[in-house]
């Protein structure tokens, strides 16, 4: 007979891969602390998630998956950003979640919810004794930048933006939706909504680690009960305390695992450029052609993730032309790839999950940000953490092939002083990431403290 669970927690993710992964990892950490966890997914993604649950991954955990009715069919486009969609989503999710909590006996001790679902706080308040823990899937730096902007503390982007506990930020260092919030108004409003009730939440959890953002974290802590609990990547790449935790456990894309790993096995250590711009980014046709030309011109081996919907943008006969110097796949097992000894650097869109994965595995970075928080992450990669370089785009946002060649040379060149410094800094942050979630590490202690506070 096992020890009685300390608490019961609902964990509710926004229904996209980049948000599901860190919240699922947090669920595993709670399970390891003897907390019962029910993972909530919207009804429109529930079945697809379970169909793709990796054998020995999520379905092997003592974890329940429960659908929350969002009012949409499973085949509803995940790219819908219309105001009507978000309004209907909020109404249905709030009702369905409240009904679930009412039906539970005993009631959950807490709901850990994606910060993009701020109305979950209102649901929790209707059920006395249920704590509300908002889980932020972006950095404290990005959180603080949005908060300063929404408070009206800066509006102009022509000159450097100077904010407390941060380096000066140019316009193209800021989250894209701040200086072009008409780019996609509903998404800007969704991201901004994360901060509407931060003064009222019980727990402010951030997927980061203390040594990564020392100054801005302290500024945040002076305002709110902010606790870093990251990096939320599988334990076997960090502290190795969760046996068998080698994968997030759920993947909405089919990775070409054997093809990637077999090809990497055939390459010398540190010789491969890994290229992936994430699950959402879409390159313009001319930019795709330029990236293809730049990678080929570097002379290095490269593994490039090009989603199936994007392959038509590749130059004709490109796959045949690169022969064995390059491998193009529709999706990769990214953690396994980044951990492979043949990887020399990671050319990335600088999404926060990808950034944390690379930092946790000590991989040097080439940043090619596109939207959302990515420019801010790229700024810190190059100028604050000094673990990589950022491509320089022209006034139209276009990156020429020569710039890709330059960046690869700076990072991959063995004799380059800058390259040596980048790799040294990457290894240093890797150690900090591992320490954070090791027994007694800052993030580990913060998770323990969260559990202790919600126990009734």
Swiss-Prot record:
Expressed in which tissues? Expressed in leaves.
Record key words, sorted: Glycosyltransferase, Transferase
The UniProt pH dependence field says: Optimum pH is 7.0.
Provide the binding site for UDP-alpha-D-glucose.
Answer: 279, 332-334, 349-357, 371-374
Biological process (GO), any one: auxin metabolic process
Q: Name one GO cellular component term.
A: cytosol
- InterPro entries attached to this UniProt entry: UDP_glucos_trans
- Per UniProt, what is one GO molecular function of this protein? indole-3-butyrate beta-glucosyltransferase activity
Q: What is its EC number?
A: 2.4.1.-
Q: Which domain of life is it from?
A: Eukaryota
Described by its record, this protein's role is as follows: Glucosyltransferase that glucosylates jasmonate (JA) and JA derivatives. Also active on indole-3-acetic acid (IAA), 4-coumrate, cinnamate and caffeate.
* Family label: Belongs to the UDP-glycosyltransferase family.
Q: What is the name listed in the Swiss-Prot or TrEMBL entry for this protein?
A: UDP-glycosyltransferase 74D1
Organism name: Arabidopsis thaliana (Mouse-ear cress)
Q: What gene name does this entry carry?
A: UGT74D1
């Amino acid at each position: 007979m096992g020890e009685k669970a300390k608490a019961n927690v609902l964990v509710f993710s926004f229904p996209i891969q980049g948000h599901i992964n860190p919240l699922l990892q947090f669920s595993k950490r709670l399970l390891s602390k003897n907390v019962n966890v029910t993972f909530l997914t919207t009804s429109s993604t529930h079945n697809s998630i379970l169909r793709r649950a990796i054998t020995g991954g999520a379905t092997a955990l003592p974890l329940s998956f429960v659908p929350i009715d969002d009012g949409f069919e499973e085949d509803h486009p995940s790219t819908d950003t219309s105001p009507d969609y978000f309004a209907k989503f909020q109404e249905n999710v709030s009702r369905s979640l409240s009904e679930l909590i009412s039906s539970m006996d005993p009631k959950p001790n807490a709901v850990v919810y994606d910060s993009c679902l701020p109305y979950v706080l209102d649901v929790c308040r209707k059920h006395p004794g249920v704590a509300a823990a908002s889980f932020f899937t972006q950095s404290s730096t990005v959180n603080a930048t949005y908060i300063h902007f929404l408070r009206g503390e800066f509006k102009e982007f022509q000159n450097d933006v100077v904010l407390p506990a941060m380096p000066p930020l140019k316009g193209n260092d800021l989250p894209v939706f701040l200086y072009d919030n008409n780019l996609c108004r509903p998404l800007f409003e969704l991201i901004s909504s994360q901060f509407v009730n931060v003064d009222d939440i019980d727990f402010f959890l951030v997927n980061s680690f203390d040594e990564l953002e020392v100054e801005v974290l302290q500024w945040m802590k002076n305002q709110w009960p902010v606790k870093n609990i990251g990096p939320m990547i599988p334990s076997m790449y960090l502290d190795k305390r969760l046996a068998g935790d080698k994968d997030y456990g759920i993947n909405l894309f089919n990775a070409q695992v054997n093809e990637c790993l077999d090809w990497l096995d055939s390459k010398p250590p540190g010789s491969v450029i890994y290229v992936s711009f994430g699950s959402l980014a879409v390159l313009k046709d001319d930019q795709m052609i330029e990236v293809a030309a730049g990678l080929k011109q570097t002379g290095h081996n490269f593994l490039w993730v090009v989603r199936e919907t994007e392959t038509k943008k590749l130059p004709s006969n490109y796959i045949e032309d690169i022969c064995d110097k390059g491998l193009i796949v529709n999706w990769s097992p990214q953690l396994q790839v980044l951990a492979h000894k043949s990887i020399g650097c990671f050319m990335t869109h600088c999404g926060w999950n990808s950034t944390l994965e690379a930092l946790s595995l000590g991989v040097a970075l080439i940043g090619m940000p596109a939207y959302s928080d990515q420019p801010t992450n790229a700024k810190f990669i190059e100028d604050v953490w000094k673990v990589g370089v950022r491509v320089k785009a022209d006034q139209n946002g276009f990156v020429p092939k020569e710039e890709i060649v330059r960046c690869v040379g700076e990072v991959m060149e063995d004799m380059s002083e800058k390259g040596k410094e980048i790799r040294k800094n990457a290894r240093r942050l890797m150690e900090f990431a591992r320490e954070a979630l090791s027994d007694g590490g800052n993030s580990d202690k913060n998770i323990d403290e969260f559990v202790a506070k919600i126990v009734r």
